Amino acid sequence: MTEVRMTSREARQECRVPFSGFVIHSSFSRRWRSGSALIAVFWMIAVLGMVMFTGAKALQADTDYTRTMRGRIFAKRYAEMGLELARHPAIQHDDPLLHFSSNDDGGYNVTLVSEEARLNINHLLQTGDKVLLRRLFTRWGFKPEFTAALYDALIDWVDADENVSLNGAEKREYEKAGLEGLPFNRPFKEVEEMLYVRGMDIVNTERPDWREWFTVFGSGMVDVNDASAELISLLGDVPMERVQPLLTFRAGRDGTLRTQDDQRLASVPQVAQMLGVFNRQTVEQLTQWIQFAGPIRRIESVGSLGPLQRKLILITQGGQAIWRGELPLHGKDS
């Protein structure tokens, strides 16, 4: 026999691998395994990239949350600073100390107004005054049926009995809605309680600033020297443009409210004349609804840090605090 010798290179070239009925050269098998490994590497890179991206986004979200919470805390601190400063009896509505800005883009702005420059919800309901509330809800765009039902539900909330008004809601109606222990059948102790009344959730959605219109303190007569233009328009039942002469008078010569030259309204005939109201019934209503120097003080302090703001309220009477809380700032980062 003739011995055949092959070099190692020739042997490798002649080595064959059976695969599915085909004979594959070893060089092709090696390239196939290398390609599979490369694909696996690409997959690992993609997975690691996704993990790193997710981690980075989570870290960014955590950082943003921490920054926001820090900003809210400092904004509230500034608001508290303004609130405590404004409590001093010597501070007047035009005092420059009511406004402060710091080097860290923070600060506070404080406003001193009469708490009675709002509608006293308890007084309106207990005296059976349907005119102002229905007029208000109608101006806010609510239909007459909803307005009537909401008014009756408010009446049922503050009266002492369990008799249901025509479109109102007492214990049974609230229980059907899954709400136990309602209504309280007593006057509102604070404005926020109004949110529990059936229908007020809709008002809260459509008019999130509704809290700014009401109070539970005072005699029930609105202080027109601090009342908003919208509220004065409501009281006089006149369009907004008719309120402008009154606003101009209050602002004084410099045209800026809450400065030293501000002027104060003093009588119902003066208010009626500026509003262009000469109807006897309307003048009589104004006599019942308005006053000119409410004794209850409302301190509104807005603290800020960058775009973040917090609004704190302190209500005082005779130098004593009777309510303190925080209200949302609508249309602002808070």
Model segments located where?
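Compositionally biased linear targeting/interaction segments
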Residues: 36-334
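N-terminal leader/signal peptides at the extreme start of proteins
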Residues: 1-34
